[in-house]
């Protein structure tokens, strides 16, 4: 039953803000006061809730027996204490060139290592098989 009143309040605030400002969804304190007079179960918190909401307006719902915050644009949380951060990395297309930069470097290092190993193997193999004395190598 209390959610019904809260939904009715927010629907009235949104409709009223669209009617007054065209496309902006911003609610002033006077709009909430005018809306809550129609619904006696929901009212502004008063002096006990002045500092309850950090970035928003405090509303007291009788059925819930507690305070509820209507956050200003750009804030979220139970007491409107968190700033809504926009993640720009997800909105942009990922840069594919930076993801391929390590690949050629790794391939180049592997290729050079294989070539060096092959040259060392050939050098040692030919050195062992060709251990001939120096006088035999001299051509007459």
UniProtKB/Swiss-Prot annotation:
The chain crosses the membrane at residues 101-121. Residues 1-18 form the signal peptide. The record marks 96-97 as: Cleavage (By host protease). Disulfide bonds join 45-58, 53-69, 71-80. GO terms for biological process: epidermal growth factor receptor signaling pathway; positive regulation of cell population proliferation; positive regulation of mitotic nuclear division. It comes from the Viruses. One of its GO terms (cellular component) is membrane. Residues 41-81 form the EGF-like domain. Residues 122-140 are cytoplasmic. Keywords: Disulfide bond, Early protein, EGF-like domain, Glycoprotein, Growth factor, Host membrane, Host-virus interaction, Membrane, Secreted, Signal, Transmembrane, Transmembrane helix. Induction: Expressed in the early phase of the viral replicative cycle. InterPro entries: EGF-like_dom, GF_C11R. Residues 19-100 are extracellular. GO terms for molecular function: epidermal growth factor receptor binding; growth factor activity. Glycans are attached at residues 34, 95. Belongs to the orthopoxvirus OPG019 family. Variola growth factor interacts with host EGFR and promotes EGFR dimerization. Stimulates cellular proliferation (hyperplasia)and mobility around infected cells to promote rapid and efficient spread of infection. This effect is beneficial for virus replication in vivo, because poxviruses replicate possibly better in proliferating cells than in quiescent cells. Acts by binding host EGFR, inducing its dimerization, autophosphorylation and leading to activation of several cellular pathways regulating cell proliferation or cell survival. This is Pro-variola growth factor. It comes from Variola virus (isolate Human/India/Ind3/1967) (VARV). The gene is OPG019.
